[in-house]
Amino acid sequence: GIEEKYKPVIEKHIKFFANKERTQRFYDLEIENFNEENILVGLLSAVCKARTCSFEEVVRIVLTDGELVDNAFLQEFEKYDLLSAFWQLCEQHFGYTDTKPSLERLLVTLFVTYTGRYVQAELPAAWESFVSYKSGNIIAFLDSLMNSVLYRDKYDALSAHVAKGLNVFSAFAGMRVDDLVECDTFLAVDQVLVKWLISRLVSEDIGAIVNGFTIPELCEKRAKMHFGRKTGKTYQMLSSAYSMVKEADYHAADGLKSIIDRYLAADYNMDQQYRKFYYYYDQLVSTESFVPLRDLVEYIYTNEYLACLLPAWNAGIQQDAAFSAIPLQREFYNANLRYTKERTVVIISDAMRYEVGQELFARMQDDPKCTAKLSVQLSVLPSYTRLGMAALLPHKTL
């Protein structure tokens, strides 16, 4: 039970206990060791209908389930003489204090303090008054919100609200990108980084380093951070663009066998990254800022890769030894199926070019239950679907 010395706390808030349902919610919290703070947090928790006696949970409910202005929970706190206790606990837990406290300024304090821990540069002077000395508690609180499947969308909405009020994008745009890499408080960080990445790629600056990260390393890192759910496809597209730009000065190998060997070892990646670039590009809501990069990727693929590779391939295929360079598609049945005793499924797909098969092969290799092999064969000419299917089936002539 509650010790006699804490009875004045109960008496001060006796109005709260006038309702049996409210009273029961308080006792359902099963507070083990009563003291003044636990009692006050318990009362606040009961008003918010929280399931645990936790001030962090009270603040979470107040911020995510209510409005920042005319908040219904704060009105309830005031009704039961708990509002001053709420703000005192905000100071105690989060270091937030104000002559006229408000949820708006509390929220800004939380986000600015969190940002200050991860941005390596000085924050704008106008933000300094919002930096709290209780950064550890604030980081733990916001981490729990942003990493929760239940509350991450609420976090994003609160983050966007603060970002708009503080004009965060403009503030970050004036900082070095190196100083922003570790921060994911606001989506604006990714917007600044993406803008910088586009400029580097369009300039073909593939050696750019940001805070120790190469362009693909930065893309991978940011895609795994909080806003990766929204920005992941953009970073994957930029990473594919990097792979294309890196091969801008392409030179084909000499001879069909050398061309094939190099394609199997490395050049297939050009086709693969080109496909992935457009796969992610086509999923973007807005592509306007990416048009110069798309044009560069298209130019490299068409005018520097294909324009160099295809003439070399066409010359090589006309050599006498061309059709002995690798196994032929028309020999597929005799080589793989005629004498096998196991049931075999053959999937024939026009879309499954070698680079697609290579990606599937890589995924199958990661499956411990699967044994995968990848080999190549030379298709028939002319290369069209019906003739290709016939070449894979038992036949005497084509």
Each PLM stretch: what is its role?
Residues 350:
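Ligand-binding pocket scaffold of soluble enzyme catalytic domains
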Residues 1-344, 353-398:
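…; additionally, a secondary subgroup of soluble metalloenzymes is captured
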